[in-house]
Every structure is written in C-alpha cells, then in structure tokens.
Amino acid sequence: MFEKKVIFVNTFDNIMIKKNCICIIGGAGHIGAPLGLALSSKGYNVILVDKNTRNIKIINQGQMPFVEEGSAKLLKKMIYKKKIFATNKLDEVKKSKYIIVCIGTPVNKFNPNLKNFINFFYDLRKHLTKN
C-alpha cells in the first residue's frame, strides 16, 4: 500500500521518541496536515505519514500542498523547531505514543468503501508493538 522508496526523512532525535509524539496516518492530506499543524503548535512532536510522495516533499520544504489559511507560516515555524515532519515510511508509527488515522473512505450509494481502510490496518499491524 505504501511505497518502499523513502523520499525525505528528517526524523526526530531519539530523546523525543514516544515522549509526546503523535503519528498521523494520511498526514499529508486535507484533514491530517492541518491537524498535525494544530497539534505541533501545542507542543506535540508530529510525524505525518502518507503515501502521497508529492505532498510529503512539499510539506518537508515548508509549504502546504493546498490552500489552508494561515498554515504556510505555521508550517515553516514548526519545521524549523523540528516539531513536525512528513514521510512515507509507515514504520515511523513505532516512534509514536499515539496514532491518528485520517484516510479516506469513499461512499458509493450510501455505502462506505472500506477496502483501503481494511488494507491499511493489515499493513499497519506489522509495525505495531506491545506498549
């Protein structure tokens, strides 16, 4: 489901891992990215994980991949403070205390298509550990 190629990784120092770290799956999208910015601005270390490598690259360059009022300046500030970064490496969830999933579930005639959601959890379980 997620590409194996790593385009950019600017991981947190080991000291910060799990202390107050949140991983947002679907983090480069219209829900995950603004949520990540809000959490990082409140002091959390945020890892945005997404399969959209184009958006990951744009975010890590300090730009938003879509228009979100006031977010461009905040994103640059949070990247400078090393409070947020984006990657396509799903195994980054191991560094987080909390995981938030923001992936799409398209609806077809009033029925959600859960195929991507279910497949994602099969991929995710390989990276989860006890505690």
What do the PLM-derived regions correspond to, one by one?
Residues 2-131:
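Structural/interface elements that position substrates and couple domains in central-metabolism enzymes
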